Amino acid sequence: MQNLELFEKAVVMILNMDGWNLHHVGGMSHYDAVGETPKKIPCVLEIKFRNTYYPTKMLEQYKYEKLMQENKVALYFVNDPKGNYLFWLNNLKMPDPIDMYCPDTTLWTKKKLLKPCYLLDESMATIVNENEEAKPGVWDSYFNKQKK
């Protein structure tokens, strides 16, 4: 859980370097950061890190409803092995929810619960940064020779 919070804080810091004014909330809040967009519009941000790539990004309906109740710009940031995706939820026509088995929210159990979720297509994201495969650099052959 501690590493996850460090990753969330890193996303907040990177967005702040790009003109945002966000503060990490942490804890049991319904969102991970609160603040302002670069245009000074109040916002809340939910951040998810996924270890596996899927072409659709899952957002629990409950989480979506809690974000929308804040009456601020609601944002959903997803990082997975293929890239980073930022969804501006207020502007989206949400698909019909689908019941999916999701981890229980308590930390001391491994059971899964059936929860209604939205599956957001990557094309619905406003900002997409795709990760690139690492390519050999100019110094790689030199350092490979040094290892032998």
Predicted regions and their residues:
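Acidic-basic catalytic patches of nuclease active cores, encompassing PD-(D/E)XK
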Residues: M1-G27
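Arginine/glycine-rich "motif VI" loop of SF2 helicases in the C-terminal RecA-like domain
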Residues: L67-N71
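A general structural detector for well-ordered alpha-helical segments in enzyme core domains, enriched
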Residues: V11, K63-K66
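A structural signal for short, well-ordered beta-strand segments and their strand-loop junctions
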Residues: H24, V44, L75-N79
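Active-site-adjacent loop/helix micro-motif of nuclease/hydrolase catalytic cores
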Residues: N51-Y64
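Short acidic/glycine-enriched loop/turn segments that link adjacent beta-strands
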Residues: G27-H30, G83-N84
